[in-house]
Amino acid sequence: MDSSRTIGLYFDSAHSSSNLLAFPIVLQDTGDGKKQIAPQYRIQRLDLWTDSKEDSVFITTYGFIFQVGNEEATVGIIDDKPKRELLSAAMLCLGSVPNTGDLIELARACLTMMVTCKKSATNTERMVFSVVQAPQVLQSCRVVANKYSSVNAVKHVKAPEKIPGSGTLEYKVNFVSLTVVPKKDVYKIPAAVLKISGSSLYNLALNVTINVEVDPRSPLVKSLSKSDSGYYANLFLHIGLMTTVDRKGKKVTFDKLEKKIRSLDLSVGLSDVLGPSVLVKARGARTKLLAPFFSSSGTACYPIANASPQVAKILWSQTACLRSVKIIIQAGTQRAVAVTADHEVTSTKLEKGHTLAKYNPFKK
């Protein structure tokens, strides 16, 4: 590839699907002269993306990990309320339930869960959440049904370095994010598909820029880029493959590639499905090479933590909205990427109002 062009995707920044709003911090009295952050919920509806009679509610919880008691003490007073030390904020995705009940009651049920946690390790540092008790309305959630969830600590804990390897740890839910989405729309691309490469292939990448509302004095700005209009983050996502040759064995021109990409009629949005995520919707026809990257209804979900854990954790607490989206065509192998120019394609949609709402519980 000896040239570089861009396919910029159109989006409506005013639409709710282009924004992710943060929870506002609201303090309430505890009755003993102290204050605590009031539990909150938020609801985002993405059921307009696809015509569907069956919607699911994806539940993402945000809360705090506490150490209960002091395991090193050998003498002490027996107390009904042992000391609880705040260690770090954390996120736990519970899974989904059918959208058949009261969403506010569903959020309230999450607050009553009893969850413990501990560290573990495989090839990465893990955090294992154990569900001790959960209301009946949550029993169909994958994590509740399995009684546990083992997750990458860096992606799910704000400050994993603060979590000890022993002692009694408790995860307390404080914020509940509910996303209503057509049942078949949430499709997480298999890792094996994302690793496919070949010299006869082109990789399609999505370069997503997200505006982040943040106080200039916040330490979070150290992880963000700055423009005249504020701060933003960059993400790079692998969204598909295309062949370099046609059925006759002739090399496919960039003009033909751009035409195929535009015919996909792509839309992009922000949501909180598997944590803060970029959602992609292809309304046009998909080739056999592109099929594994989308659900049967043409959707794909990209958890931001997989691309950039740091950016994902910033979005736990800050309002964000889509700034720009570009499709970039790259060579099909990493070696070829290193020695060839990228090709950018301009055009497609950013879904209106995909915003991550004002949460802000987790200032580190």
Swiss-Prot record:
Superkingdom field: Viruses
Residue ranges of coiled coil: none
Cellular compartments annotated: Virion
Keywords for this protein: Host-virus interaction, Viral budding, Viral budding via the host ESCRT complexes, Viral envelope protein, Viral matrix protein, Viral release from host cell, Virion
Family under the similarity heading: Belongs to the morbillivirus/respirovirus/rubulavirus M protein family.
Signal peptide positions on this chain: none
Keyword DNA-binding assigned: no
InterPro entries: Matrix_C, Matrix_N, Matrix_Paramyxo_C, Matrix_Paramyxo_N
UniProt KW Nucleotide-binding keyword: no
Notes on the domains: Late-budding domains (L domains) are short sequence motifs essential for viral particle budding. They recruit proteins of the host ESCRT machinery (Endosomal Sorting Complex Required for Transport) or ESCRT-associated proteins. The matrix protein contains one L domain: a FPIV motif.
Any one Gene Ontology BP term: viral budding via host ESCRT complex
GO MF annotation: an example: structural constituent of virion
Described purpose of this protein according to its UniProt entry: The M protein has a crucial role in virus assembly and interacts with the RNP complex as well as with the viral membrane.
Name of the coding gene: M
Gene Ontology CC, one term: viral envelope
Cysteine pairs bridged by disulfides in the record: none
Residue positions of motif FPIV motif: 23-26
Pfam families cross-referenced by the UniProt entry: Matrix_Paramyxo_C, Matrix_Paramyxo_N
Gene3D superfamilies found in the cross-reference section: Viral matrix protein, C-terminal domain, Viral matrix protein, N-terminal domain
Protein name: Matrix protein
